[in-house]
């Protein structure tokens, strides 16, 4: 195990256990001698073997540097060069399991865990989308969990800035996921049908697939090929109109769908049985053919399925667009990516080109403050625990009173964003007149441990039996 590691890495870390090894790398559970923390140490083999892999490595590091301070995004602690100048080491925060392995274990997750996981995923994706960035590779193995059921989103190798995608000349097809070995089971119809342009809806589709997989215990659309994947989707979701098909901007969509063999349909509500009505409704509203008709992440956060965990003060957004420091709409040389990454290692930080929005994002962020500092959340999971404790005592019939129409969800999303305001001193106040300082004091109360105990599923997850996947 240790023979594959450079000497200078051994000097920094005690390798405790190999968590996994694949064609592209190896991951250890390691002890950081300097910080005295347990980390996940990932060695990427031949990170700069070709321009495609070089660009993916570069993207992952750059986007993690920008988004890693969100409580639901995996933190990249450090980056280390390898002696051979081909490999690279990444030190991440350690997480006990990933959602893929948890689902494989069977009936580990209860309904409340699934709701809590989805709410945290929506928070993470809202943060990315507010910076105009798509993750593009959302799947259960990229959703990491700890014993407290806290979620961390990982693997940003396919993430792209929407602004950089818009730099493509009119009529030129944007790069799709076929350049990488990406899991097709979670791809949206517009990607499968080679759309000329795609939107934040690609991530929302993937989130719908993840939720469905948690509900039924297996992948919803396990296609064996691109065509088979499209067939499985079209035999399940609501039939799109001609306008819906035209809206994705694919030259092939109409002809492919017309030639598709007709098989008996099996709607989602017949596949996802023994689940809450709100859960089925959310899946149906996410798995819609036309991207513009899918729920947005803001609407998801106020949907009845997860609204019990919704707290606007715990859902930060960015007030600028995120660009990687190298052009992302063209592929550069291996040396370009490697040299820039090494410069960043030497500088201990990455520079992002930031374009300030004319209109400040919700919650009245102060432009004079550092953007990442604005985005930090303190004691996020404590407030979530409080929310859970309150909602578990509520009448179960309350959820039926929610109007699940898209219009109502939009109104709730807008209402939630207006719940906070600033006082005369510039300090944020919520709808009850509380300031962050007063809330923070309450968070430090002796009730903290008791509240966390109400959601801590460590006795259920048995994280030591699960395999992490970074």
Swiss-Prot record:
Keywords: ATP-binding, Behavior, Cell junction, Cell membrane, Cell projection, Cilium biogenesis/degradation, Cytoplasm, Cytoskeleton, Kinase, Membrane, Nucleotide-binding, Phosphoprotein, Serine/threonine-protein kinase, Transferase. It holds the Pfam family Pkinase. The keyword Phosphoprotein applies. Residues 362-445 are annotated as: Disordered. Its EC number is 2.7.11.24. The active site is at 137 (proton acceptor). ATP binds at residues 19-27, 42. The modification Phosphotyrosine is found at residue 180. It is an enzyme of class 2 (transferase). One of its GO terms (biological process) is protein localization to ciliary transition zone. It catalyses: L-seryl-[protein] + ATP = O-phospho-L-seryl-[protein] + ADP + H(+); L-threonyl-[protein] + ATP = O-phospho-L-threonyl-[protein] + ADP + H(+). Changing residue 59 to Q: In vt32; loss of function allele that displays reserpine-sensitive swimming-induced paralysis phenotype. Residues 409-426 have a biased composition (Basic and acidic residues). A motif (TXY) lies at residues 178-180. It is found in: Cell projection, Cilium; Cell projection, Cilium membrane; Cytoplasm, Cytoskeleton, Cilium axoneme; Cytoplasm, Cytoskeleton, Cilium basal body. Its cofactor is Mg(2+). Atypical MAPK protein. Regulates primary cilium formation in sensory neurons and the localization of ciliary proteins involved in cilium structure, transport, and signaling. Acts in dopamine (DA) neurons to support synaptic membrane dat-1 availability via activation of rho-1 thereby sustaining normal levels of DA clearance. Plays a role in male mating behavior, probably in part through regulating the localization of the polycystin pkd-2. This is Mitogen-activated protein kinase 15. It comes from Caenorhabditis elegans.
């Amino acid at each position: 195990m240790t023979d594959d590691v450079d000497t200078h890495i051994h000097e920094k870390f005690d390798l405790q256990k190999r968590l996994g090894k694949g064609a592209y790398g190896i991951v250890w559970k390691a002890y950081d001698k300097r910080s005295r923390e347990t980390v996940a140490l990932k060695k990427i083999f031949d990170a700069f073997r070709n321009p495609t892999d070089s660009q993916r490595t570069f993207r992952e590091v750059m986007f993690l540097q920008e988004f890693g301070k969100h409580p639901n995004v995996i933190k990249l602690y450090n980056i280390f060069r390898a002696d051979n100048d081909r490999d690279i080491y990444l030190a991440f925060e350690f997480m006990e399991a990933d959602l893929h392995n948890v689902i494989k274990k069977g009936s580990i997750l209860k309904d409340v865990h699934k709701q809590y996981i989805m709410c945290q995923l929506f928070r993470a994706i809202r943060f990315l989308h507010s910076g105009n960035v798509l993750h593009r590779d959302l799947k259960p193995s990229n959703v990491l969990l700890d014993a407290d059921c806290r979620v961390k989103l990982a693997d940003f190798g396919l993430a792209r800035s929407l602004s950089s995608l818009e730099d493509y000349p009119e009529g030129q097809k944007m790069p799709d996921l076929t350049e990488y070995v990406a899991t097709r089971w979670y791809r949206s119809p517009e990607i499968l049908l080679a759309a000329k342009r795609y939107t934040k809806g690609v991530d929302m589709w993937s989130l719908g697939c993840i939720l469905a997989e948690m509900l039924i215990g297996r992948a919803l659309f396990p296609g064996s090929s691109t065509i088979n994947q499209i067939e499985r989707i079209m035999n399940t979701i609501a039939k799109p109109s001609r306008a819906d098909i035209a809206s994705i901007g694919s030259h092939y969509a109409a002809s492919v769908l017309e030639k598709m063999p007709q098989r008996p349909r099996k709607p989602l509500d017949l596949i996802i049985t023994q689940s809450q009505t709100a859960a089925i409704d959310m899946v149906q509203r996410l798995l819609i053919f036309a991207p513009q008709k899918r729920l947005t992440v803001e609407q998801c956060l106020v949907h009845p399925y997860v609204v019990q965990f919704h707290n606007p003060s715990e859902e930060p957004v960015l007030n600028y667009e995120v660009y990687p420091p190298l052009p992302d709409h063209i592929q550069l040389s291996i040396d370009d990516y490697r040299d820039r990454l090494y410069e960043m290692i030497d500088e201990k930080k990455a520079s992002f080109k930031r374009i300030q929005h004319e209109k400040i994002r919700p919650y009245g962020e102060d432009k004079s403050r550092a953007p990442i500092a604005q985005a930090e959340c303190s004691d996020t999971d404590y407030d979530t625990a409080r929310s859970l404790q309150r909602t578990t005592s509520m009448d179960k019939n309350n959820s039926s009173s929610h109007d699940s129409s898209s219009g109502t969800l939009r109104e709730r999303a807008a209402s939630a964003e207006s719940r906070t305001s600033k006082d005369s001193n510039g300090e944020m106040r919520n709808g009850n007149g509380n300031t962050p300082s007063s809330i923070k004091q309450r968070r430090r109360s002796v009730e903290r441990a008791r509240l966390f105990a109400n959601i801590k599923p460590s006795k259920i997850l048995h994280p030591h039996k699960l395999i992490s996947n970074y």
